[in-house]
Amino acid sequence: MAIERNDISDPAFESVIFQYLQDFGFAPERRGDLVHLSGVGVGSGDNSVDIALNLVEMDGHRILEVSSELRAPGVSFEKAMTIAAQGNLSCVTAKFTPVENLEQGNHSVRAGQVLYADHLSGDELKAMLYLFIKEVDAIDNVLVDMLIN
């Protein structure tokens, strides 16, 4: 039996995550039930990562989905798959997938990570976000160049 993914809203939990992010020095924004971070980066990157955090429920457990769309125009499915594969070969914590844009008739590439959120601590969130942002910020420009050219 497949595990069902349900988008959920938990204002109390989202407030805690929002406060953690502020404590870490980010400037989070709420957009519906998502928490967004814009223009973040770590290390030698160029602070070009935009992140969305979304709380979902799977099989009775809360999962925090962390995702970042590459800033690039839409491309063919084949090119998006090639870029996603290159991202996956280069990163450990971030997993890249192609995303179909039905209205535009093209594809984009998204980096993602999931965190078990039933007992998520601030230190754990900080460490995993650091790793995710560092990886994505280090490779996103290379991947975007591959998408464009």
Please place each PLM-identified region on the residue numbering.
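Charge-rich, low-complexity N-terminal segments
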Residues: M1-A52, A94-K95
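Long, contiguous binding/interaction regions
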Residues: A2, Y130-A138, L143, N149
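Ordered, soluble secondary-structure elements with a strong preference for glycine-centered loop motifs
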Residues: D7, P11, E78, H119-K126
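Short, ordered beta-strand-loop transition motifs
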Residues: A27-D33, E57-G60, V99-G105
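Short beta-strand-to-loop capping motifs
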Residues: G41, S68-L70, Q113-A117
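Long, continuous compositionally biased terminal/linker segments
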Residues: G43-P73
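Short, internal acidic amphipathic alpha-helical interface segments
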Residues: I63-S108
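Well-ordered alpha/beta subsegment
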Residues: T93-Y130, V144-I148
